[in-house]
UniProtKB/Swiss-Prot annotation:
Location within or outside the cell: Membrane; Nucleus
Protein name (record): Adipogenin
Intrachain S-S bonds: none
Membrane-spanning segments: 16-36
Biological role stated in the UniProt entry: Plays a role in stimulating adipocyte differentiation and development.
Organism: Sus scrofa (Pig)
Length: 81
């Protein structure tokens, strides 16, 4: 039997298949939008002191930055990678 007796997609089944194939994609897109809006609203509620960067360590190498950091604050243990 080369072809099925009843085709899978015809005028009656097209809307049913399209809705069941598009429903998970639409639901995932909706959840992604809600999740991103939630994350953005949490970020704006925090204080803006996190946005102030100290750019001096970026001009140094990682070893110099870690050595200087351990000299200034020996009580804090930070890994040097």
């Amino acid at each position: 039997m080369k072809y099925p007796l009843v085709p899978l997609v015809n005028e009656l089944t097209f809307s049913f298949l399209a809705s069941w194939l598009c429903l998970p994609v639409g639901l995932l897109l909706f959840l992604l939008i809600v999740w991103l809006r939630f994350l953005l609203s949490q970020d704006s509620e925090e204080n803006d002191s996190d946005l102030c960067f100290d750019w001096e360590p970026w001009s140094k190498g990682p070893a110099e930055f870690c050595q200087e950091e351990t000299l200034h604050s020996p009580e804090e243990e930070r890994p040097c990678w």
